[in-house]
């Protein structure tokens, strides 16, 4: 009995506790990411943004949470009630479940599986089903058109993201996210005789793929300038037209969880994860999770600045960019990187 408890029960309890702790921390982080998004946009437009609830508006997201929770959900007449309510739940659960394999620091991961990046790519591909379900179950043409646009957009840019990931995997030789970060201890900088620093990270040696991944991440998460499925001037509010209260909150939560995931993936694949920018003793004292969080926040700041400055694309421009520019460019980079690795004997 004791061996059964120590072998199965206790590890399960620890994993559940870790999952709950990560979930709570992630939800709080998303609340402040949402606030930061509004604050940055307001600052660019010379406004103050949310500043009433709490000091500097720090509790605005929690006030919005209470507002959504206590509002009555309204289901349209003729809608498929079960699918209508299931769609936002599917979206948010899939978006949150991907974080189980994301290493926040060395050893700070719930499931350190050897196919971590493949797991994230597979789960992220399933998120489009929640959007399609929500648009179809609303029994309205505008949400359905918005859902179709969103599905086409996400599928289009997943191909480019997949090729970018393949390029990184060719350089690292592993699907494990921790191995991808550790492989960035040495890189282009050390080959040139420089000390270990941010010049070794993949953003420099794979710079074209870094740009493609960043722009594709914007499109994958329906962020501006690729927010066509939700653009007020395009299709009212996309697939979320008929949603309100808690179901709408779940869609927003899933969207920002996916945005945070893309920031974390950019950090892991190209910005060295939890590695300090320069390998010196004083920076190595800083916990890895601090470096990881700072890098992810920097990537999100870039997301927010793109939202503030770049005008929205037309739908045909969006599709042309994905299929006629990013797809051939990323495919060519895969071939070039594989050729260089084989030629130099690094494969």
Swiss-Prot record:
Molecular function (GO) terms for this protein are: NADH dehydrogenase activity; oxidoreductase activity, acting on NAD(P)H, quinone or similar compound as acceptor; quinone binding
Q: Main EC class of this protein? A: translocase
| Keyword vocabulary terms for this entry | Cell inner membrane, Cell membrane, Membrane, NAD, Quinone, Translocase, Transmembrane, Transmembrane helix, Ubiquinone
Q: What is its main location?
A: membrane
Its localization reads:
Cell inner membrane
Q: What family does this chain come from, according to its entry? A: Belongs to the complex I subunit 1 family.
Q: What is the protein's known function?
A: NDH-1 shuttles electrons from NADH, via FMN and iron-sulfur (Fe-S) centers, to quinones in the respiratory chain. The immediate electron acceptor for the enzyme in this species is believed to be ubiquinone. Couples the redox reaction to proton translocation (for every two electrons transferred, four hydrogen ions are translocated across the cytoplasmic membrane), and thus conserves the redox energy in a proton gradient. This subunit may bind ubiquinone.
From the Swiss-Prot or TrEMBL record, give the protein name: NADH-quinone oxidoreductase subunit H
Q: Which organism is it from?
A: Rhizobium johnstonii (strain DSM 114642 / LMG 32736 / 3841)
